[in-house]
Amino acid sequence: MLLELERVSRSFGGVHAVDRCSFAVRQGDIHGLIGPNGAGKTTLLNLVSGLIQPTGGSIVLAGRRIDRLPPHRIAALGVARTYQNIRLFPDLSAISNVIAGEHLRRRDTVLESLLLLPSARREQETARERARALLARVGLLERAEERAANLSYGEQRRVEIARALAADPAVLLLDEPTAGMNPAEVSAVGRLIAEVASQGHTVLLVEHNVKLVMSICRTITVLDFGEVIAEGPPAAIATSPAVIAAYLGAKP
Amino acid sequence: MAGGEPRPTETGSTPVDHRYDASLSVNLQDLRDFFLTYQSVIGFAGINGLLALSVYATLSCGQLSLANAGFMAIGAYASALLTVHASLPFAVVLLAGTVAPALLAVPLGLPVLRLRGVFLAIATIGFGEVVRLGFVNWEYTNGALGLVGIPQRAGLGSILAALAVTLFLFLRLRGTRTGCALEAIREDEAAARTMGIDSTAHKLAMLTLGAAVAGLAGALEAHFTFMVSPGGYTFGRAVDMLVFAVVGGTAHPLGPLVGAAFLTALPEILRAAGSSIGIPPGPLRLFLNGAILLAVILFLPEGIASLWRRYGRRRVREGHAA
């Protein structure tokens, strides 16, 4: 297991946003995380990426506890993410956003640049080339120089995925990557996620589009009111009475 | 394109060269007069340029620090004391004036950089005032009177050289791994952290760099004006530096320099222009000074330096239309 959550809890005041959640993500899997609004999905991603700390339980990545580490250390261990409410750097160009995402892969130093060493320029060009390749992969090469704030919603989501991939992460956390997209864009992102997973990145996918989740995930965890109510392969989840009750309401 | 044409300059070269020579020597003479007349203005513009860059250092990672008048005071006093009490070479004195505030920036930054926005600004104002009041009450440096009669060791050469070195540093930072990380922190610190950027370390480094540059400016100013006194390092001074940077624009390191040069020269320009068109000296010119400042902030929110970019963009657009 690459990522293991063991009885993870997080409460805000009296609200148990995440309550003793336990589940594990297998290496190379596309693991879906679904649940009604307010089930605690985004809180869980914030806990895994270190933006907030759990009030209980443990999170283990590749055998190492990460639940008390600051976000940049967790990122260095191989966790990258996108955000439900898109957090691109609005004033930077699309390509500069992706280049910023390469921070963990770059090795150039300020000193090299100050000494006008050719290696500094070379590294910067390599970073730019890699970013161009990633933008091409999400189909946005021709928008590379556009300010992120000027991109359409769907384009911004794709740049954010490219930026997360720029770190070459072991685990990619995607928070509703298809929200606000049209069906054609949704299926393109679905194909992209499948391709990313086939290249060895493990994906933890929070998504409201059930059709997409059912078609690309191998394992699905269902949250409701901060608790895991079901887990298993898509076919089992689709017929689980607990899941149907959570989404549609229980029969009286 | 010009391959088939004879070169006209080669045939009648002597008279043409002569004319150019004459005009060149006149220009050089004008230039020398200009430099001699405005030596101090240029010197102060250079010092203010350094101060503007010192604020730009923290602004470039999105932090509003107003501690730089305090750092400047430390650089000024440290260097002045070394000059007066130990006859060290000027380069060593300048180095000490640069390093001393930088060393202090680290213990200041560790607790203070946990604060954000206006809270950071207020905490750093506090630091500046503590430094200033410390010097007011320090008998060794003559308290509020300060040190006078410091030998003049800084001139246009050393000021402009310091400015060039500092500007070079900021220019070379752009596009490096660190430079990209600073931009990311400025735009969205939390997002930057989840990309593996240690925001605290970067913010601390820039606060320290800003302190070093402010200290260098303080050391140069002390040896340019022969004196240091606590009154030169007030909260108002910290705000002045911020205004230079903001008026010039903080998108590029040249912006703060443009702002500092513009605002340092503005009173001189107004004096020259004012006496030629009959505006009397005094409050009216101060009013004009303020009005121009306000106009820049209102109509060029990205700073004077953005004019150049706007012009460039318009030319591109016209080029596409044509």
Predicted features and spans:
Chain B
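Transmembrane alpha-helices and adjacent helix-loop boundaries
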Residues: 19-322
